[in-house]
C-alpha cells in the first residue's frame, strides 16, 4: 500500500515542486491537492499543474486531511492554523514548512497528533544545522557569531526562518538565551559582545543563501549553504512525510528534519 499524501498550497512554487516529487516517488501517491478559494483551478484536474491523475483541486482542507495518510503544507500562517486544526480533528500527521508563524504554539497541537515542522526541509541545511551546533560547542563564547541570509525580493519574513533556526541552534549549544542575545544590525551602534548578529539581503530570484561566521581577532570560520533549486526543499518534505508516517503516525509529538536525517 502506498502512502496517501495530501498537499496544501498546490499552486504555489513549493506546492508544484512537491507534487512533482510525489509522482516520482514509488512509496507515495497523491491523495488530494488544496488551492485557495476562488482559484480558477478549483474542481479541475491537477493535470494542468503536473499530470492527469484523476485528482481534482479543491479548496477544502478538511476533505484532504480526511482522505490522506499524511499532509504536507507550505502556505501562510493563517492557512497553517487551519491545517493544524484539521490535523487534530482527523488525527492526520502533518508536515509543514510554513514560516513566519510567530505566536503559533505547535506543541499544543502536537500533543494530539504527529507534527513535523522545519523552517527548511533541505537535507543540506539540516546538515549545516548539525555543523554549526558542533562548532558552537567547540568554540564556546569566545567568537563573535554572525548569520547572513539572502532570498528573493518577494520574501516577507526577515530574518528567514532558517536564519533564526541557525541562531537558536548556536544559542542552545553555547548555553546562552537566544532572545536576549540576538539582534539585527542597524544604526551606528558597535557590535554587542556575545551577541548573535543577523544581516539580511533581498534581491532578484535568489532561492536561499545562508552563511554562519564564527569570528575572533585571529581567524574566521565560515559555514555556507546555497540552494540551487527548490526541488531540494520538495524532496526533503516528501522524505519527511514518508518518515513521519512510517515511524510516528501513532505517536503525537513535535518533530523536525533533524529527526529525519
Curated annotation (Swiss-Prot):
Residues at the active site: 151 (proton donor/acceptor), 155 (proton donor)
Subcellular location field: Cytoplasm
PROSITE patterns: DAPB (PS01298)
Pfam families linked: DapB_C (PF05173), DapB_N (PF01113)
GO cellular component: cytoplasm
Upper lineage: Bacteria, Pseudomonadati, Pseudomonadota, Alphaproteobacteria, Rickettsiales
Species, as recorded: Wolbachia sp. subsp. Drosophila simulans (strain wRi)
Keyword NAD: yes
Family, similarity comment: Belongs to the DapB family.
Task performed by this protein: Catalyzes the conversion of 4-hydroxy-tetrahydrodipicolinate (HTPA) to tetrahydrodipicolinate.
Catalytic reaction equation(s): (S)-2,3,4,5-tetrahydrodipicolinate + NAD(+) + H2O = (2S,4S)-4-hydroxy-2,3,4,5-tetrahydrodipicolinate + NADH + H(+); (S)-2,3,4,5-tetrahydrodipicolinate + NADP(+) + H2O = (2S,4S)-4-hydroxy-2,3,4,5-tetrahydrodipicolinate + NADPH + H(+)
Record-level GO BP terms: diaminopimelate biosynthetic process; lysine biosynthetic process via diaminopimelate
Pathway the protein contributes to: Amino-acid biosynthesis; L-lysine biosynthesis via DAP pathway; (S)-tetrahydrodipicolinate from L-aspartate: step 4/4
GO molecular function list: 4-hydroxy-tetrahydrodipicolinate reductase; NAD binding; NADP binding; oxidoreductase activity, acting on CH or CH2 groups, NAD or NADP as acceptor
Binding site for (S)-2,3,4,5-tetrahydrodipicolinate: 152, 161-162
UniProt protein name: 4-hydroxy-tetrahydrodipicolinate reductase
UniProt keyword list: Amino-acid biosynthesis, Cytoplasm, Diaminopimelate biosynthesis, Lysine biosynthesis, NAD, NADP, Oxidoreductase
Binding site residues for NADP(+): 36
Amino acid at each position: 500500500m502506498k502512502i496517501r499524501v495530501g498537499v496544501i498550497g498546490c499552486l504555489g512554487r513549493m506546492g508544484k515542486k512537491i507534487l512533482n516529487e510525489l509522482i516520482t516517488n514509488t512509496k507515495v501517491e497523491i491523495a488530494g491537492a488544496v488551492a485557495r478559494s476562488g482559484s480558477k483551478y478549483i474542481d479541475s484536474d491537477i493535470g494542468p499543474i503536473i499530470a492527469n491523475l484523476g485528482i481534482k483541486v479543491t479548496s477544502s482542507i478538511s476533505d484532504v486531511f480526511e482522505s490522506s495518510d499524511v499532509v504536507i503544507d507550505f502556505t501562510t500562517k493563517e492557512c497553517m492554523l487551519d491545517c493544524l486544526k484539521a490535523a487534530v480533528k482527523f488525527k492526520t500527521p502533518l508536515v509543514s514548512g510554513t514560516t513566519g508563524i510567530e505566536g503559533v504554539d505547535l506543541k499544543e497541537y502536537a500533543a494530539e497528533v504527529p507534527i513535523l515542522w522545519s523552517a527548511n526541509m533541505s537535507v543540506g541545511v539540516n546538515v549545516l544545522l548539525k555543523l554549526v551546533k558542533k562548532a558552537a560547542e567547540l568554540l564556546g563564547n569566545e567568537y563573535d557569531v554572525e548569520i547572513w541570509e539572502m532570498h528573493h525580493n518577494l520574501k516577507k519574513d526577515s530574518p528567514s526562518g532558517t536564519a533564526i533556526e541557525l541562531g537558536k541552534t548556536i544559542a542552545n549549544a553555547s548555553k546562552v538565551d537566544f532572545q536576549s542575545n540576538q539582534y539585527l544590525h542597524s544604526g551606528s551602534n558597535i557590535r554587542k559582545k556575545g551577541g548573535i548578529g543577523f544581516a539580511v539581503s533581498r534581491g532578484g530570484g535568489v532561492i536561499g543563501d545562508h552563511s554562519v561566521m564564527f569570528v575572533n581577532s585571529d581567524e574566521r570560520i565560515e559555514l555556507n549553504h546555497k540552494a540551487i533549486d527548490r526541488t531540494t526543499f520538495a524532496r526533503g518534505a516528501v522524505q519527511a512525510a514518508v518518515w513521519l508516517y512510517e515511524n510516528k503516525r501513532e505517536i503525537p509529538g513535535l518533530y523536525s528534519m533533524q529527526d529525519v536525517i
